[in-house]
Structure formats: structure tokens, C-alpha cells
From Swiss-Prot:
Stated name of the protein: U1-lycotoxin-Ls1v
Similarity comment text for this entry: Belongs to the neurotoxin 19 (CSTX) family. 04 (U1-Lctx) subfamily.
Propeptide feature ranges: 21-41
Species: Lycosa singoriensis (Wolf spider)
Coiled coil: none
Length: 107
């Protein structure tokens, strides 16, 4: 009976050690993934910044990704140029307002 307990204890120790090694590998992979996501986040264009040259590079807001919103600007010379900025579309603003109000009510 004592031999069985010793063997079971050894097996449990080996299994826990091997699973902890696997977890360490997973944590290293997650750390690399998080670093890559952070790098991507740094490269995105923040809210209210110009996105004329990169219309799909806006960052994420609280709930939605910001959209590149463009307007045509007419200079004093009569030249028309397109200027774009990252912002929250009106329907996203409304959805965020409803969600924020719901959170306040539900606590």
C-alpha cells in the first residue's frame, strides 16, 4: 500500500511539474502576443488625429473602433482638399450613451 502511495505521489508531482512548464510556455506566448498588440496599438491613429493618409488605421475606442471621417476643405485660393480625422460616428456615440446609461441604472 505504501508503494502505491509513493508512486501516486511521484506521478502527481511529475504531472504538476509538466503542466507548470506548459503554463510557463503559454505565459511566454501570451506575453509576446500582448507586446505585439501593444505595438499595434501604438501604431494606430488616436481620436481627433488626422487619418487622411491611412483611413483604416484608427484606434479602438471604449466599445467600437474609431472611423476615419473626411470632409472637403476649400482654401482661400478655391482649392478643394480632403481632410480626415479619426472620430466616433453618431450612431456609435448613441450606442455608447445607451450602454453607459444602462450601466448607471444597473449599477
Amino acid at each position: 500500500m505504501m508503494k502505491v502511495l509513493v508512486v501516486v505521489a511521484l506521478l502527481v508531482t511529475l504531472i504538476s511539474y509538466s503542466s507548470s512548464e506548459g503554463i510557463d510556455d503559454l505565459e511566454a506566448d501570451e506575453l509576446l502576443s500582448l507586446t505585439a498588440n501593444e505595438q499595434t496599438r501604438k501604431e494606430c491613429i488616436p481620436k481627433h488625429h488626422e487619418c487622411t493618409s491611412n483611413k483604416h488605421g484608427c484606434c479602438r475606442g471604449n466599445f467600437f473602433k474609431y472611423k476615419c471621417q473626411c470632409t472637403t476643405v476649400v482654401t482661400q485660393d478655391g482649392e478643394q482638399t480632403e481632410r480626415c480625422f479619426c472620430g466616433t460616428p453618431p450612431h456609435h456615440k448613441a450606442a455608447e450613451l445607451v450602454v453607459g446609461f444602462g450601466k448607471k441604472i444597473l449599477g
